[in-house]
Amino acid sequence: MKLIIFTGLVLFAIVSLIEAQAENEKACLPQYQVCTDAPGNCCSDLVCDCYGRYKCGARIGRNCFCLQKGVIYKRED
């Protein structure tokens, strides 16, 4: 009887550990994906870069995207 209880506890511990590891290994966001609500989820070679949106000089929002580190984007007319 003690062996059955011990085996059950060990299996429960293993399942709990597997579930905890699965939560920590969430998929990262690829390049150009929106990261406004999840700034830390971009893949390792990317950074969550945010830009303010303005209309008539007033800020109306913010957009964030996973972009390459060290790359500067400039507006083209």
From Swiss-Prot:
| Gene Ontology MF, one | toxin activity
* Tissues in which the UniProt entry reports expression: Expressed by the venom gland.
Note the InterPro entries from the entry: Spider_toxin_CSTX_knottin
Cite a GO CC annotation: extracellular region
Q: Where is the signal peptide, in residue numbers?
A: 1-20
Modifications after synthesis and translation: Contains 4 disulfide bonds.
Instruction: Kindly name one Pfam family recorded for this protein.
Output: Toxin_35
Subcellular location per the Swiss-Prot or TrEMBL entry: Secreted
Superkingdom field: Eukaryota
The alphabetized UniProt keywords are: Disulfide bond, Secreted, Signal, Toxin
Those residues forming the propeptide, per the database entry, are 21-26
Record-stated family: Belongs to the neurotoxin 19 (CSTX) family. 08 (U8-Lctx) subfamily.
* The protein's name: U8-lycotoxin-Ls1r
This chain's source organism reads Lycosa singoriensis
| Upper classification of the organism | Eukaryota, Metazoa, Ecdysozoa, Arthropoda, Chelicerata
